Swiss-Prot record:
Gene3D superfamilies: HUPs. This is Phosphoadenosine 5'-phosphosulfate reductase. The active site is at C239. It comes from the Bacteria. One of its GO terms (biological process) is sulfate assimilation, phosphoadenylyl sulfate reduction by phosphoadenylyl-sulfate reductase (thioredoxin).
Amino acid sequence: MAEFNLAELNALPKSGQALSLAVVNGQLETLSAEQRVEWALEHLPGEFVLSSSFGIQAAVCLHLVTRIKPDIPVILTDTGYLFPETYQFIDQLADKLKLNLQVFRAEQSPAWQEARYGKLWEQGVEGIEKYNQINKVEPMNRALETLGGQTWFAGLRREQSGSRAHLPVLAVQRGVFKILPIIDWDNRKIYQYLTEHGLSYHPLWEQGYLSVGDTHTTQKWEPGMSEEETRFFGLKRECGLHEG
């Protein structure tokens, strides 16, 4: 497969980037998740980073990537509003998988944000987007800059939502390569991988949560709801990290 020049790709519009990566994406679609990781480590520039929200199925991508590159920095953008079970899950996985965990937070504390802006997540789509910009997007941009990340692994899957249904394996986002090794996995394959490797779902899975983010914008699944409707009051699916 071809080698790519990140600076040249960043000079192109999104459509041009997609066209330039189309052939290699066709080839990547035929590879296993492990082979995609190995290909990226060989053909894409370092530093390499892996992001995780430590959500319902987070153990899969964390285990898969760190088996191949154990010391890869694992970026968590901590809003300060995660479920207690999420913080416990983070500790458990960090210990079990010996993660090189790198935690980044907003420059303003949650209390200061509420004093300054009120509860942004109660202020419609505009408020949610401002909240995400402060607590997710800016810390992630800072993480990439601090760690010198040029290739970013993430655990998104097409099956999770309409906004992810057509994502390619490889793209350019935030000026870096972004590769999604398990993009084409379904829930059955996730379950099989977890079972095979003695890994667990997030603790809230057993309580009916299909997707887990902050306490104030995550709902337990109810009959008739899509997975997308369990986040951000159904107003939007993405927290901002995987947009743009």
